A protein has these predicted regions:
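SET-domain substrate-recognition elements in eukaryotic SAM-dependent protein methyltransferases
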Residues: 15-82, 88, 98, 105-108, ...
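Short, Gly/Pro- and small/polar-rich lid/capping loops
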Residues: 95
Length: 247
């Protein structure tokens, strides 16, 4: 995936589970693994491509069971509580945000508010390159997956795994930033079946079904990877990787 190779090698003790990790029982883990195998088959078999709607319904049924099993492992937090820590983190790491504040706008979400008048073409914000989250600036552990086909050829997948690594490893320097990220987005992955039905007859339906299928395949694939390999990434994500956290 084009990452620089000047990273420290990972020898010796691997990262242990973070305080945020909660283990599934062996029985529930086995049940989840079986569901993931079924999910991978449904989302990978080319025979289902010509039956995209029925395939979507089958995938949704399996995912509902998956999310019920993983529900106990999903936490929520109030993003606005981390604003002060986030702004301090920015300035301590060289960002310039004078005259701006992060606020919660009623009926919307978090955003930037000007606390002073700015002239036309005036620079209002300056963010160092080192504070731009990417697979080059974060999650050096990802190097162990550099030959994984999904990580290697799909930059958005590599970035998603990098975000999870930094979120769940101990003492991540990116924690103030990650705590500010939204917990949900307005995409087809958050739509219920009844919502998807409304897209029938629209040219966007096929793209939406394909997106849902792709994410289901990626999730089931990485679930198997993290459960069956021993490396720094699996040590961090094995017990915290869930469908909802991934998508």
């Amino acid at each position: 995936m084009g990452r620089k190779k000047a990273h420290t090698s990972f020898k010796g003790k691997q990262p242990g589970p973070s305080p945020q990790q909660r283990h599934l029982s062996a029985a529930k883990r086995n049940e989840l693994n079986v569901l993931c195998e079924k999910l991978f088959h449904l989302s990978s078999n080319p025979a289902y491509v010509t039956q995209s709607w029925n395939n979507y319904l089958d995938i949704s049924e399996v995912l509902l069971k998956v999310k019920r099993l993983e529900e106990m492992k999903t936490e929520t937090s109030q993003r606005s509580q981390g604003i002060g820590q986030f702004v301090n983190w920015l300035t301590e790491n060289g960002a310039r945000v004078d005259g701006l504040s992060v606020v919660e706008f009623s009926g919307y979400d978090l955003g930037l508010r000007a606390e002073t008048d700015f002239t036309e073409n005036e620079l209002i914000m300056e963010i160092p390159r080192g504070l731009i989250f990417s697979t080059y600036t974060a999650a050096s552990e990802l190097l162990v997956l550099q030959n994984d086909p999904l990580v290697q050829h799909m930059p958005q997948v590599a970035l998603a795994i990098a975000l999870l690594i930094e979120k769940y490893k101990e003492n991540s320097k990116w924690k103030p930033y990650l705590d500010m990220l939204p917990s949900s987005y307005n995409t087809v992955l958050y739509m219920k079946t009844n919502d998807m039905i409304e897209l029938k007859g629209s040219p966007t339906l096929e793209a939406a079904l394909k997106q849902c299928r792709n994410i289901a395949r990626q999730y089931s694939y990485f679930n198997k990877v993290f459960q069956n390999t021993n490396n720094p990434v699996s040590a961090i994500l094995r017990d915290v990787f869930t469908y909802e956290r991934y998508w």
